[in-house]
């Protein structure tokens, strides 16, 4: 296949520097996937995925298999193992199966970290390279996690955590224990411990339970008479996840609570 026929082409090298992975597409969804053996002189570009009906990307090469994150036959995404000798979908084997919640994947410390979005909140599961579930990470609170990444030989990884009362803070993660420790945080003159966040569910008109995060100062009596800022968003398959805003914080002080 002539790669120049595609509108967008990108490439990356696996961490072990053995394979060049090439993604090609003509639109913003769905992609073709190819690879080239960098250890074999005059190696040809080989095909992994020969249609653009799904999104797929290689996250690693391990034990003569590509680990691929894909939404092929899995709307919420899964990880499959594809043998290098026969990497096309007919030979894919589920490595970490799809769940009811969407997933994003990070690597580091010779482990795989899968972030699931459950009711608009982050939960992170740790797996080994045999696909075995090890633990759910104990996060600093109800909020959003991003950027758990590192090299395979790293024993300490870093990630960012935030919610409506916690500005973006960097935590260090011990991959052997799954324990986190605050590394650094934004310098803002306020005390997060003065605020409370909790999740509730509101039944909409059609019976759907809609998750809501309520944030307010400690000590407020929740009697239904407090001024409240209510904000929501729904569209384009985008979920509104907790994030810190100094403007919302000041609004909370004035309005008593927001959700």
Predicted regions and their residues:
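A broad detector of the eukaryotic-type serine/threonine protein kinase catalytic domain
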Residues: 234-237, 256
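Peripheral, non-catalytic segments that deliver or gate enzyme domains
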Residues: 1-226, 236-249
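Single conserved hydrophobic/aromatic residue that forms the stacking wall/gate
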Residues: 250-259
């Amino acid at each position: 296949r002539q790669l120049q026929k595609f509108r967008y082409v990108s490439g990356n090298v696996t961490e072990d520097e053995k394979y060049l992975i090439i993604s090609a597409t003509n639109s913003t969804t769905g992609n073709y996937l190819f690879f080239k053996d960098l250890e074999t002189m005059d190696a040809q570009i080989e095909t992994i995925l020969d249609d653009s009906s799904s999104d797929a990307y290689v996250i690693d090469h391990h034990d003569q298999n590509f680990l691929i994150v894909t939404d092929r036959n899995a709307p919420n995404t899964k990880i499959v193992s594809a043998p290098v000798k026969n990497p096309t979908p007919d030979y894919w084997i589920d490595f970490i199966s799809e769940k009811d919640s969407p997933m994003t994947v990070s690597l580091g410390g010779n482990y795989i970290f899968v972030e699931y979005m459950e009711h608009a909140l982050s939960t992170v599961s740790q797996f080994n390279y045999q696909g075995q579930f090890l633990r759910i990470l104990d996060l600093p609170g109800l909020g959003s996690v991003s950027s758990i990444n590192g090299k395979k030989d790293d024993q300490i990884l870093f990630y960012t955590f935030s919610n409506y009362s916690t500005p973006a803070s960097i935590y260090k993660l011990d991959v052997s224990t799954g324990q986190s420790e605050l590394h650094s945080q934004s310098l803002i003159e306020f005390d997060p411990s003065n605020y409370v966040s909790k999740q509730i569910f509101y039944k909409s008109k059609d019976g759907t339970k809609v998750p809501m995060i309520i944030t307010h100062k400690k000590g407020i009596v929740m009697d239904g008479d407090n001024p409240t800022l209510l904000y929501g968003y729904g569209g384009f398959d985008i979920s509104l996840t907790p994030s810190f805003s100094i403007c919302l914080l000041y609004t909370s002080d004035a309005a008593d609570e927001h959700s």
